[in-house]
């Protein structure tokens, strides 16, 4: 639904090669969205039938970049396995925008996805990531849904050491995006987080 709406807007500026109604738009199964598709359990080969017949296909994402912090790696992996050429194209990717805006190490970083929702497990994972960052200098990137931002921020402020630097970036692909990078000591005095 969102893809069709987007392509309709694109078509108003630049004509599509085919009428919108002629395009076959398929969504990855819900299970792939919930559990990810990096495990290799999802067989994406049937989605590539048109490409095997010589047609161009695309893989899109509603927010971010397919296969990077979003589902899609199974489709890309299947394309490689089937000998289909893969060309990655991107617009603004919030992870890289956040890293570039943070003032943290952009030469060595890791994206660790979502942290656990259960408070004790989340605090344990935060301590592990902080230890890794302090030991290696590697920036640790993670994401959270807006409705869990307050709980995440509370865990971070309570768990991290006072001198640890934390950058919180939100809505960076929007016109009113924000990024704030402070030590935990400073965050404890002003812990407000944007809800973009």
Question: Where are the model-predicted features located?
Answer:
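Short, surface-exposed amphipathic charged segments that create phosphate/polyanion-binding patches used
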Residues: 36-48, 125-129, 178-188
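A polyampholytic, Gly/Pro-enriched intrinsically disordered region
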Residues: 43-57, 105-114, 185-196
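Class I SAM-dependent methyltransferase SAM-binding "motif I" and its flanking Rossmann-like core
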Residues: 70-132
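General beta-strand structural signal in soluble alpha/beta enzymes
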Residues: 61, 86-91, 142, 168
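A short acidic, often aromatic-flanked loop/helix-cap motif at beta-alpha or helix-coil junctions
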Residues: 31-41, 117-120, 174-177
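Short, hinge-like loop/turn segments at secondary-structure boundaries
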Residues: 13-14, 102-107, 128, 159, ...
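A contiguous loop/helix-start segment that scaffolds small-molecule binding in enzyme catalytic cores
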Residues: 55-56, 135-196
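Class I S-adenosyl-L-methionine
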Residues: 1-87
């Amino acid at each position: 639904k969102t893809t069709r709406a987007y392509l309709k807007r694109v078509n108003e500026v630049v004509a599509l090669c085919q009428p919108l109604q002629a395009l076959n738009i398929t969504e990855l199964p819900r299970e792939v969205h919930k559990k990810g598709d990096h495990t290799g359990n999802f067989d994406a080969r049937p989605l590539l039938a048109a490409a095997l017949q010589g047609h161009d296909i695309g893989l899109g994402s509603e927010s971010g970049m397919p296969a990077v912090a979003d589902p899609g790696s199974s489709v890309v992996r299947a394309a490689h396995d089937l000998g289909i050429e893969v060309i990655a194209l991107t617009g603004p990717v919030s992870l890289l925008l956040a890293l570039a805006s943070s003032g943290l190490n952009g030469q060595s970083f890791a994206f660790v996805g979502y942290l656990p929702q259960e408070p004790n497990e989340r605090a344990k994972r935060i301590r592990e990531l902080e230890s890794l960052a302090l030991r290696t200098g590697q920036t640790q990137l993670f994401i959270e849904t807006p409705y869990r931002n307050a709980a995440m921020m509370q865990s971070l402020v309570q768990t991290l050491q006072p001198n640890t630097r934390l950058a919180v970036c939100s809505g960076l692909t929007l016109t009113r995006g924000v990024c704030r990078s402070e030590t935990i000591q400073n965050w404890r005095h002003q812990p407000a987080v944007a809800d973009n």
